[in-house]
Amino acid sequence: FYRETAQKGRRYINISEAVIDVYKTPYKDRNVERDRVQIYKGRKLLSEKASDTLAVKLLGGPNLSVYVDVVKNPDLLLDPNILPYYAFRMEESVMLNDRPHYVISFQPQAILPYALYYGKLYIDKERLSFSRAEFALSMDDRNKATEAILRKKPFGLRFKPVEVAFLVTYNERD
């Protein structure tokens, strides 16, 4: 499932939702370039007010689901060069889908020229495999967060991201 929203003040001016099928190549390849996304069913709700129409281009869309796979695309969070910039902490174990899981929370512990993430990783205790990743772009420095997601905007437009969050779930398939 994919959802993306944009607000102007307290009103939603754009809501995009879709049920998507993600076609993944084997994880041993560690390459997201050949993964594909197909929209099974979708809808988009746009504000009809002319003043709500923005010529803003953001990082996003259904294809983003391929790139936020932290296992297949470790550059996002699990790259050995990036790990020292995070503080990791073991949380209390939880049950997900009737299976025990380790929970590892992480948050930035360094100030870099770009925004980092914070969140939780869920690891199946028996299989020692990822089952879920919940993470969000740190808004500690809104300018860095804006640079991370904003691709194009009209001159003079003030743009302030409120939240950029991801939930990635992993299911075992034969």
Range-by-range predicted roles:
Residues 1-85, 97-100, 150, 154-174:
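Surface-exposed, low-complexity/disordered segments
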Residues 75-77, 89-91, 101-174:
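Gly/Pro-enriched, hydrophobic low-complexity segments
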